[in-house]
């Protein structure tokens, strides 16, 4: 979910802004600086190889603001993604990680979203709480990550709701476009009555589904054991403070455009007054 700095430019003003001074009067053209991004080539609404995801478009927006362009390394988002990409030096930026993610240095958040209930609009469930008694009998679909369960599945299990819950792999069938969309498709077909999914994913595919689907945010349980909301940031290597600072400045500068982009993709946004989330537990990350 970077800019590649060279020691030879340290004595110059930033190349992406002005170019270096020279001893000749001829005008100099600053070379473009690459924002090297590692991303999943088949993971809409976040990213794909055609550049159709909102993280693709955000990366382009930031690179353009820095006077450069995006260079991608494509890598399926699986266990070990950060280790095999960012930490291995294949790129300088990964988009879409929880703010405070422990395996990297993270930027300021650029949005905050929530898990949501997703159901067919004609059912009129209008669910909000995991303690709603109807969840004991409704057929529920959730994303799963291998042997790991995301927060909704854990909270349902804590309430003894397991027998009527079906798991859909967040990885899906990678041979097909948009593998995570299988959960939304299950709701539209009527295979499950309601799904609990990460809001950005659900919002994007719900607007394209037929019949119409209804989406409502999941209320945060009173015990607070598993968060339902997350602030999302970008990851850089732990020692790359300079790049983080530049990305932070660009995120602040592009705030209105970023909000408009997220709304265009149907991302349900949650107000975030602090934009400074503490480090989040690795097991409590949104599934995507």
Name each model-derived stretch.
Residues 16-19:
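C-terminal motif of bacterial Sec signal peptides marking the signal peptidase cleavage site
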Residues 21, 53-66, 121-124, 131-147, ...:
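Extended ligand-binding regions for polar small-molecule ligands
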Residues 22-103, 174-177, 264-268:
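Extracytoplasmic small-molecule ligand-binding "clamshell" domains
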Residues 22-23, 69, 147-172, 248-288:
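Ligand-binding clefts/hinges and TM-proximal coupling segments of bilobed small-molecule sensing domains
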Residues 34-48, 130-159:
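Short loop->beta-strand "edge-of-pocket" segments that line small-molecule binding or catalytic clefts
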Residues 40-43, 112-116, 122-124, 167-170, ...:
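Periplasmic-binding protein-like
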Residues 60, 64, 69-135, 144-148, ...:
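Acidic, polar ligand-binding/catalytic clefts
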Residues 68-69, 87-96, 137-139, 182-183, ...:
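Alpha-to-beta junction loops
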């Amino acid at each position: 979910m970077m800019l590649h700095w060279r020691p030879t430019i340290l004595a110059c003003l930033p190349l992406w802004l002005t170019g270096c001074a020279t001893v000749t009067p001829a005008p100099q053209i600053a070379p473009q600086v690459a924002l090297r991004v590692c991303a999943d080539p088949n993971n809409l609404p976040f990213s794909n190889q055609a550049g159709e995801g909102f993280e693709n478009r955000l990366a382009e927006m930031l690179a353009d603001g820095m006077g450069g362009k995006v260079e991608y390394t494509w890598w399926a988002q699986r266990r070990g993604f950060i280790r095999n990409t960012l930490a291995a030096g294949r790129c300088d930026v990964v988009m879409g990680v929880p703010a405070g993610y422990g395996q990297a240095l993270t930027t300021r958040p650029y949005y905050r979203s929530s898990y949501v209930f997703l159901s067919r609009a004609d059912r009129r469930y209008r669910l909000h709480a995991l303690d709603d008694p109807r969840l004991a009998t409704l057929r529920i679909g959730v994303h799963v990550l291998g042997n790991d369960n995301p927060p909704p599945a854990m909270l349902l299990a804590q309430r003894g709701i397991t027998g009527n819950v079906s798991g859909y792999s967040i990885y899906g069938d990678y041979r097909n476009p948009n593998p995570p969309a299988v959960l939304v498709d299950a709701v539209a077909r009527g295979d499950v009555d309601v799904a609990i999914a990460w809001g950005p994913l659900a919002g994007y595919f719900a607007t394209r589904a037929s019949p119409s689907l209804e989406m409502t945010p999941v209320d945060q349980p009173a015990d607070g054991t598993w968060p339902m909301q997350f602030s999302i940031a970008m990851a850089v290597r732990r020692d790359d403070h300079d790049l983080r600072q530049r990305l932070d400045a660009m995120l602040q500068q592009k705030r209105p455009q970023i909000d408009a982009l997220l709304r265009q993709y149907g991302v349900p946004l949650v107000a975030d007054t602090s934009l400074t989330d503490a480090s989040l537990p690795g097991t409590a990350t949104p599934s995507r």
